[in-house]
A protein has these predicted regions:
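Long, contiguous juxta-domain segments that are non-catalytic but functionally important
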Residues: 1-8
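Short glycine-/aliphatic-rich beta-strand segments at the starts of folded cytosolic domains
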Residues: 8-34, 98-102, 233-234
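Short beta-strand elements
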Residues: 16, 152-156, 218-225
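Short acidic/polar capping segments at secondary-structure boundaries
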Residues: 138-143, 159, 172-175, 189, ...
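A hydrophobic, small-residue-rich beta->alpha segment in the mid-to-C-terminal subdomain
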Residues: 216, 224-260
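Bimodal "functional hotspot" detector
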Residues: 261-281
C-alpha cells in the first residue's frame, strides 16, 4: 500500500489510524475471543515483525496490533490471513461477535456459546450498516457476556420441571435459587415462573435428579449499548430457537439499513419508532 490512505475505508476493514498517518492499529477478527496457542504465538511474532511488539486485548475480545506502518498493511494482512486471524472490522459494520465460555467450560452454561457465536459471525460479520452493530452471546442469566448492553444479545436459558416422585424435600434447590422462585409445597416443591430467570442452577444441584430441563432456548434482547448515551436492551423473546436468533439478527439489520439515521444506534432507533412497532418489523 503506497497510495494516499483512505482512512474511512481502511477503518471499516480493521486498519485504524493512530492519529499519525504513518502508523495504524490493525484489529484482528477473533469471533468469541477464541484462539489456538499456535495462533497466539504467531500473532506475537507478527506484532514484533510489523509493529512495536505490543498487543492489546479489546473490549470485544479481539486483538489489536499497534504501530504498524501504512506501507506494511498489505504484508501484515497476508501473514494474518495465513494463520486464520484476518483483520476485523470497525466503523459502521457488524463488529466482532463476543461470548462467554458457556458449555462445556462453564458449570453454569446452558448452551454452546462458542458454536453459536461462530455461526453468527459466519452469517453477519462485516455487514455494512448506517452505524456499528454489536452482538453478544452469553450462556446463562449471569450475563457474563453482557447481552443487555449489546445491540443484539442472546442468552442461554433452560426451563426446569420436577418429577415429584423423585423429590425428597431436601431443600437444596430452595436454598440455591437466588430468585426465590422455588417454594416447599406439601413436602415437595413448586416453581414460580414469574420469578424464575431460567438459569438452571436448581437442575444442577438436585441430588436425586428430580429436577430436569423441560426445554432449552435463547432469550433475545435488542437495543442495548453503552457509550455516551447508554441504553439497556429490551427483552423481546424468552424462549427462542436457533432459527429465531438468526432471523431476528437478519431482520434487525434489514430494519437498521432501511430506517436508521446516520450515526443512530439500534436502541435509539427503537426509542424513536417505539419498541412495539420495531418488534412488529422483526418478528
Amino acid at each position: 500500500m503506497t497510495d494516499k490512505p483512505d482512512f474511512d475505508k481502511l477503518k471499516k476493514s480493521g486498519y485504524i489510524s493512530q492519529g499519525n498517518p504513518e502508523f495504524f492499529v490493525v484489529r484482528l477478527r477473533v469471533p468469541a475471543g477464541l484462539l489456538t496457542s499456535e495462533q497466539m504465538i504467531e500473532i506475537g511474532r507478527i506484532a514484533k515483525k510489523y509493529g512495536n511488539g505490543s498487543l492489546h486485548i479489546t473490549e470485544r475480545q479481539g486483538i489489536q496490533i499497534p504501530y504498524v506502518r501504512y506501507t506494511s498493511l498489505g504484508k501484515i494482512t497476508e501473514d494474518l490471513e495465513a494463520i486464520g486471524t484476518p483483520p476485523g472490522s470497525c466503523g459502521p459494520r457488524v463488529r466482532n461477535i463476543t461470548s462467554c465460555p458457556g458449555m462445556p467450560e462453564c458449570s453454569h452454561g446452558n448452551i454452546g456459546t462458542y458454536e453459536l457465536a461462530k455461526k453468527i459471525d459466519d452469517l453477519f460479520f462485516n455487514v455494512d450498516l448506517p452505524t456499528k452493530l454489536k452482538v453478544s452471546v452469553t450462556g446463562c442469566p449471569n450475563s457474563c457476556a453482557k447481552p443487555q448492553v449489546n445491540d443484539v444479545g442472546i442468552m442461554g436459558v433452560v426451563k426446569p420441571r420436577v418429577e415429584l416422585n423423585k423429590c425428597t424435600s431436601c431443600g437444596i434447590c430452595v436454598r440455591t435459587c437466588r430468585e426465590g422462585a422455588i417454594k416447599p409445597l406439601n413436602e415437595k416443591i413448586s416453581f414460580d415462573f414469574n420469578r424464575c430467570v431460567f438459569c438452571g442452577d436448581c437442575i444442577r444441584v438436585c441430588p436425586t435428579d428430580a429436577i430436569e430441563g423441560e426445554k432449552k432456548g435463547y432469550t433475545i434482547f435488542v437495543g442495548g449499548n453503552v457509550g455516551r448515551h447508554p441504553r439497556f436492551a429490551d427483552k423481546i423473546v424468552t424462549f427462542g430457537n436457533e432459527d429465531a436468533v438468526f432471523k431476528i439478527i437478519d431482520n434487525c439489520i434489514r430494519v437498521f439499513e432501511d430506517e436508521a439515521i446516520s450515526g443512530e444506534r439500534l436502541g435509539h432507533l427503537i426509542d424513536r419508532i417505539g419498541i412495539g412497532e420495531f418488534v412488529k418489523k422483526i418478528l
